[in-house]
Amino acid sequence: GVRSGISSSGPGSTITADDIALTASIDKGLGDFLKRDSRFSIQGTFRDVQISALGSNNRYNNFTIDGVAANDPLGLNANGFASVRNPISVETLAQIRVDFAPYSVTKGNFGGANINAVTKSGTNELKGKFYGYDTDQTNVGDVLGEPVSQFSDETKGFVVGGPIIEDKLFFFVGYE
């Protein structure tokens, strides 16, 4: 018989590159893409975003990049990531795979969700782009009738990928 290469050890979801490209986001934060799944609750704003899975504390999540842990080991950041900003550029993501409390012994050290950011890889075609995003106080609503403090946040970067040896060896680089 035919055997599938896809395995699952519990409930989960996959956010594809197309989903990422079509989702409106002010700061290109991971929370903006994860909230497409109703099992997540996103609290806070911009740098203090807290991602809760299935009602658990945000620190119970495990965040990985291509399977390598990228958590906050000291518990200093409210978001649970190793950095205050996004730990990886959204432009480098091929997909975001989420597993909610899987029963596999190969996935552990968390009780909420395993959020795995899968990066893009190079192909036989040389492709790349430069990008930039900025935001300031003009993007903030005037809900309480209070003046908003001035601020500015700019993000600039590039991604490029292609072949080193056609059909055998590829590269992909991103900088932000």
Residue ranges and their predicted role:
Residues E146-Q150:
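Conserved ANL (AMP-binding/adenylate-forming) active-site segment centered on the GW(Y/F)…HTG consensus within
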Residues F130-D136, V173-Y175:
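Transmembrane beta-barrel strands of outer-membrane/channel proteins
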Residues K168-L169:
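Repeated loop/turn-to-beta-strand initiation elements of outer-membrane beta-barrel proteins
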Residues T123-E125:
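Short helix-loop capping/hinge motifs at secondary-structure junctions, enriched
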Residues S56, Y175-E176:
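Short, well-ordered beta-to-alpha junction loops that form the rim of enzyme active sites
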Residues G1-S121, N139-V143, D153-G162:
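Periplasmic N-terminal accessory/gating domains of Gram-negative outer-membrane beta-barrel systems
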